Amino acid sequence: MATADKMEAGRQANRLRSALSDAVMRIAAKVGKAQGRLRPADIARKAVGDFVTKVDLRSEQQLRRELTKLQPQAGFLGEETEVAGLDNDWLWVVDPIDGTSNFARGLPHFAVSAALLFRGQPVLAAIHCAPEDALYTAVHGMGAWRNRRRIEAPRGRFDDGAILGCQWFRGQQDMRFLTQLQSKGARIRTLGSTVVQLADVVRGRLDGNVQQQGRLWDFAAAGLVAVEAGLRFTNWHGQPVFP
């Protein structure tokens, strides 16, 4: 009976992964078409160096409607709109456009990201990375996929040829840390999207990604993809971000 229950749970997870994938791809298609039609009036500043567009807002609203239908008992946390049900066991965490500044300037490095958490642990994820027009998905304990094919991350290199993605580094202390990395031969890349950079680590285009800070919607989905692809995803003390 336990085996049958496990098989049924796996089938349900794959059905939900497929539905989430379809929702993210629909949003990604609309976001891609909208990029070339942005006007200055469509872009607003939230804070220094932080922007939001009308496309962000529309995309998050549509994702909220679709994901709520998939898992009605789940709360919702998005970057751009009000939150709901944060105390629920289940929680959708969404970033409609990770890399909005790139998107607003016509640059290709942005992504659509959505994850379903159960009691704080990501269990389902889907991200669409615009630079490669690729869909990444993951299910906790079942693996990761790229364009619906299983993917395992290659082993990164950490010698003097390592190429590392970096995000959210500011201030003198952060700059000293980056200088230390570079003194050991690492080459630094900042693409402006945590999701895109983590996907590049999964693909082996980057050997790792480090960042000083981030919000849950920045890494919930991409972090699960990375872990299910065989990578370590830790805090500064080497502890798993999601135990």
Per-segment meaning from a language model:
Residues 75, 124, 207-208:
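Short, Asp-centered acidic motifs that coordinate Mg2+ and/or phosphate
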Residues 39-44, 144, 184-191:
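Short secondary-structure junctions
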Residues 1-97:
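N-terminal subdomain of lithium-sensitive/metallo-dependent phosphomonoesterases centered on the IMPase/IPPase/PAP
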Residues 57, 80, 96-99, 130, ...:
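Generic detector of well-ordered alpha-helical packing
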Residues 86-145:
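DPxDG-like acidic metal-binding loop motif
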Residues 154-243:
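An extended, acidic
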Residues 146-153:
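A structural micro-motif at secondary-structure boundaries
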Residues 27, 31-35, 56, 67, ...:
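Residue-level signal for inorganic ion chemistry
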